[in-house]
């Protein structure tokens, strides 16, 4: 645990990215400890009796003493130091977890500050610097926290504390405040996925228990995402924060507040632009769909936002966008579908025409979705003209036989939906193609005449043929 900064952090804004300026190239390590303060000598803890071995009347005082003992931090990077005391603290933490789970009347008003102090001493620390240019979260193994044998039990204890039937938010709010939440959110940048998973549960419990902190938590998550999108593109806990948001959005009251709608359009939609989208796309798509199920009128700005940020050069991201778009179409209201069908299917037509077969294949799979097919059938007079030329051309020219087979199935479906328009479009397409071929032939003949004329002029100029 690092020493406190000279200037206390503002509670108006969380900075989960302050470490970026001090990130340096480093050798990859499998473990790191970010909380040890050098003691200079071996640590000695006075062994205390087990809680179950003392009379019930003495247990509250002993509980407080054990909480105070567990504030001592050990160096886990030195695997040979303080082995006995490390094991003693581990067993004490285990005992505290069991005690708070099964005992009744253990959460007196005096225990709240000691619990929060013990948790704070153990989990709040400066995270080890990470060079985002060298570390690829999709390829590299994360840096695991060496002190996890203790840290895990501290998190487990804190969760049991928050979930206890005796827990009183009215007392706890004196100690679990905005400053505590800020420090908790900074820890979401931990590279250790085990820690982020526990943090997710802790923050979710705090959001549920402390009504007065809810708006503040949403605001700080908003700040983290904005910094992530527009400045750093580095934050390890985006997926976990989005998972929490999915539950929060699900609980929003109707009608939605303007701030919630703004968060969707100004924060969640731009999250699609970052390079590491694949790490949290499933959670992001879930949040988007939750918003649309709450308020279908948001469908149009969401679809237009996705069209605006549609990937131009990354086929993998295109496939993800298409998957998310299908999730949206699964819950779209027919009245909303009509508003966005033209720009939507112009984009789908481009995807179907993609030389990358996975993009084309994912777009063509829309026609296997019964609900989407029903929407297409109801609006075939608009959608068929948009899609037809791309589909017909692909059926003749695409390099991948699997794509050609899928296109034939789509064309067959369109023909069954609206045979009259299909025949008209076929005739028009063939007529246009013949005109294009005729123009192309005329263009070639014109160029040939011009080349011949230029050749003759050159020969006359050189006196090879008489003028």
From Swiss-Prot:
GO biological process terms held by the UniProt record: signal transduction
Recorded GO MF terms: protein phosphatase regulator activity
Region (Disordered): 1-39
Pfam families tied to this protein: B56
One GO CC term, this protein: cytosol
Subunit (UniProt): PP2A consists of a common heterodimeric core enzyme, composed of a 36 kDa catalytic subunit (subunit C) and a 65 kDa constant regulatory subunit (PR65 or subunit A), that associates with a variety of regulatory subunits. Proteins that associate with the core dimer include three families of regulatory subunits B (the R2/B/PR55/B55, R3/B''/PR72/PR130/PR59 and R5/B'/B56 families), the 48 kDa variable regulatory subunit, viral proteins, and cell signaling molecules. Interacts with SGO1. Found in a complex with at least ARL2, PPP2CB; PPP2R1A, PPP2R2A, PPP2R5E and TBCD.
Function: The B regulatory subunit might modulate substrate selectivity and catalytic activity, and might also direct the localization of the catalytic enzyme to a particular subcellular compartment. Interacts with cyclin G in vitro.
Record family assignment: Belongs to the phosphatase 2A regulatory subunit B56 family.
Protein's UniProt name: Serine/threonine-protein phosphatase 2A 56 kDa regulatory subunit epsilon isoform
Species of the source: Mus musculus (Mouse)
Lineage per the UniProt record: Eukaryota, Metazoa, Chordata, Craniata, Vertebrata
Gene name of the record: Ppp2r5e
